[in-house]
A protein has these predicted regions:
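Acidic beta-to-alpha connecting loop that harbors the catalytic carboxylate
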Residues: 74-77, 102-104
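Helix-to-loop junction immediately C-terminal to a conserved catalytic motif
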Residues: 160-191
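Catalytic active-site module of serine/aspartate enzymes centered on a nucleophile-bearing elbow/loop
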Residues: 86, 92-138
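Conserved alpha/beta-hydrolase "acid-adjacent" motif
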Residues: 77-84
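Short beta-strand/loop motif that positions the catalytic acidic residue
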Residues: 63-65, 70-76
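Catalytic core of membrane glycerolipid acyltransferases/transacylases, capturing the structured
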Residues: 183-252, 257-258, 269-286
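Conserved alpha/beta-hydrolase catalytic His-Asp/Glu region
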Residues: 2-61
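Non-catalytic C-terminal accessory region of glycerolipid acyltransferases
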Residues: 117, 123-154, 254-442
Length: 442
């Protein structure tokens, strides 16, 4: 019954280890008396009792309504944890599964496993009866941040992101000196293909400045239906751990009221899952959405641009191509039939917020570039921006600034001698792997 991965268990002190060894050694002679204490008839009776109890529990699992989180060890040598987890998921009304491929039977005793992080990632931590994605959130820990950075380490190494910001006087500098240090702030920008920019952006800003960006994300990332479709149910846990919340007016209001830095992509899924030839094209609603809410709290609006997706891959099959494939309509229905609907009252391409995969072909990696534009203050302009026309004018100005940021980066990256990973590898070979690699002059 002690089957487990002892290599991953938390080490004990020498004294405790010796005491455990002495106790175990002392118990060995007592094992010979087990046959007298537990005769065959007793064992048979206990097995029958266990089967009866198991049948009783299984017959009532469907009535359990409480939130249930099932942890399934992939390396469990004692019980078929993965199979049992799938069975429970089909019987319990409010169940979510988290698979741990490399963990053993005693997963809770293993050093690398963090139960609190797992609960946070599943969205099961709450402070009250009702789930509140804003107030329920627990700040990311140093270990969680390190794991998030490690998860994107390959992408960050391959793209070596360059971050620029704009000072209040309009001067563009390398680094994040142009970002305000206090909220509320709304970061509004372009959503790269498949959200490639999210990891380097959120973790890079947090590690460099201590500013924790809270993203407004598609509700699909928080739904159980998405977990049942994806190969890994925990694929989106990191977004929750890093502070993402479903994009709703209420959540936006709460984040601004608590003076957070809020990351907003008006183009949403249509922008992140764009078609061939649509890179760096904005798909924003025609009418302003965030301006009046931002002005209500005196939030600073910072437009930003991000480029580099076309330097790491090309779109091979987009949504239009997938719809022509045999049987894809089955997957399309599973992805979107029960998914939360966004932009239903919008016009134009932005209303097409269907979720779907994108098939890409990789390229020799180039480089990611970010530039945060000049901060736009709304403090003291609440009455002015209540006027729809003035709010719309500011909205279009923000959109224009985002487009200008993108064009600026597309032009300036041509001047970067280290845009290619090959040139960066040669530079690091000569100057050391920890050396910051130069880029163009802002």
């Amino acid at each position: 019954m002690l089957s487990g991965n002892f290599m991953k268990m938390r080490p004990t002190s020498d004294g405790a280890g010796q005491a455990l060894s002495d106790i175990t050694t002392g118990l060995l002679p007592s094992l010979t008396y087990l046959a007298d204490i537990l005769p065959k008839e007793s064992i048979v009776w206990k097995m029958k009792m266990l089967r009866t109890a198991s049948s009783f529990v299984n017959s009532r699992l469907h009535a359990v309504k409480a939130q249930t989180l099932v942890l399934a060890s992939g390396n469990d040598e004692l019980l078929p944890s993965r199979e049992e987890a799938e069975r429970l998921d089909g019987m319990l009304q409010n169940c979510r599964i988290r698979h741990f491929r490399d963990n053993g039977h005693k997963i809770l005793l293993e050093d690398e496993f963090d139960l609190a992080t797992t609960i946070k990632g599943a969205g099961y931590y709450r402070r009250s009866r009702q789930t509140d994605f804003v107030s329920d959130y627990l700040p990311v820990t140093p270990d969680e941040l390190e794991k998030a950075i490690n998860r994107d380490r390959v992408l960050s190494f391959a793209t070596d992101p360059v971050m620029l910001s704009t000072l209040p006087d309009g001067k563009i500098v390398r680094g994040l000196a142009g970002l305000p240090r206090e909220g509320p702030v709304v970061l509004v920008g372009y959503h790269m293909l498949m959200g490639f920019e999210l990891g380097p952006l959120v973790t890079g800003v947090l590690k460099s400045t201590g500013i924790h960006i809270r993203g407004l994300a598609h509700p699909f990332l928080f739904s159980k239906s998405s977990e049942q479709i994806l190969p890994d149910p925990s694929a989106h846990d990191l977004h929750r751990i890093m502070g993402a919340v479903p994009v709703t007016p209420v959540n936006f209001y709460k984040l601004l009221s608590e003076k957070h830095f809020v990351l907003l992509y008006p183009g949403g899924a249509r922008e992140a899952l764009h078609r061939k030839g649509e890179e760096y094209k904005l798909f924003w609603p025609e009418q302003s959405e965030f301006v009046r809410m931002a002005s209500r709290f005196g939030a600073t609006i910072i437009p930003f641009g991000a480029v580099g997706e076309d330097d790491i891959c090309d779109v091979l099959l987009d949504y239009n191509d997938l719809l022509k494939l045999p049987f894809y309509d089955i997957l399309d229905k599973r992805l979107n039939e029960d998914a939360p609907k966004l932009r239903t009252d919008s016009t134009g391409e932005v209303k097409n917020q269907d979720m779907h995969p994108v098939v890409v072909t990789p390229k020799v990696p180039g480089r990611f570039y970010f530039v945060f534009g000049k901060p736009i203050e709304t403090r003291g302009r609440e009455k002015e921006l209540r006027d729809k026309e003035k709010a719309q004018h500011l909205y279009l100005h923000v959109k224009s600034e985002v487009e200008s940021c993108i064009e600026y980066l597309k032009e300036k990256r041509e001047e970067d001698p280290y845009r290619s990973i090959l040139h960066r590898l040669l530079y690091q070979a000569a100057h050391g792997s920890d050396t910051e690699i130069p880029t163009f002059e802002p």
